[in-house]
Structures are given as structure tokens and as C-alpha cells.
Amino acid sequence: FPNGGVRNTFEARGYSAWDPSSPVFVVDDTLCIPTVFIAYTGESLDYKAPLLKAIQAVTKSALDVMHYFDPSVKKIISYLGWEQEYFLVDEGLYAARPDLLLTGRTLMGHEASKNQQLEDHYFGAIPPRVAAFMKDLEIQALELGIPVKTRHNEVAPNQFELAPIYEECNLAVDHNMLIMSL
């Protein structure tokens, strides 16, 4: 198809490169290889390349500071500990909410009751159905190599949280993206 451009339309001029700092993993029957996607000019075309550049910049700056205290320091490793909070909604209630069905998120609601105290939820025991869900989620996470460490209730009703062991920044971000897809 003529397009009036200087290059063929099938030439995207973007390059994918394997990110060896993040391990490959298998989902169902598919081998997934973490990659970066950059333009032929070097511009980032995804979210991973800017993250790697930011980690590199933090490492360089941290090394500069560390050399004031100990000139023999050769390497800095940045760690990240994220938390993933989520709400659990019964399927029947979910189906009755057009905002959840259409967008996957809450768009309508109302303010909490005045002086509503939710310590009973935050400090309470995890309900058995929720604990079973959490266990299944943790097993799926471990199958992908995500070391989930903690689980607990959060402040709002039906709000819960999981968190993994601290990991190197790049790997922690990859694992967070994977957790959100489970």
C-alpha cells in the first residue's frame, strides 16, 4: 500500500531487547521473556526502559554520595517493597454493578457513615472464604516466582492486602505487574 513515507509500512523501527535482570517465566504453556521496547532513535516505547534508566540514575547518584564515606564502594542495589491492595466483591454483587462490569473499577458510591469505626475489620480475623482466596492467589504467585510474604485485612470493608519480600527494583516492578494480572 502506498503511504507516501520514506520506509515500508511493515518497518516499525522499534526494537525489543531481552531484559536479563528479570527472569523468564511460564504462564500456562507460554514462555514469557521480560523485554524493553525502544525506538531506533533510543526513545522509550514502553514503561520498562524508563524504569531501567531511572534505576541507573539512582545508582550513579547513590555511588557518588557513598564515595564521600567509602571510596571502595563499587555497586549500589536499589530494593523495593510494594504492597498490593485489593477489594473482593462477590460475583453476584459484581454483576449488579454496571460501573464494575464496564470499567473494572468503582465509579459510583457514597461517603462512609459519620464516625464509622472500622478497627473491627482492620484488626479482625480474615474470613475463611477470603483466606481460601488468598491461599490460591499466593500459590499462583509462587508458581510465577513471586515470593509473597504477608497478607492481612485493610481498613475498608472487603479490602485486603498482600506484600512480597523486598526485591531489586526492576524485579519488584515486574512481579507487581504480574500479581495485578492474576
Question: For the regions a protein language model found, what residue spans apply to each?
Answer:
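Glycine-rich, acidic/polar active-site loops that bind/position phosphate-bearing ligands
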Residues: 1-182
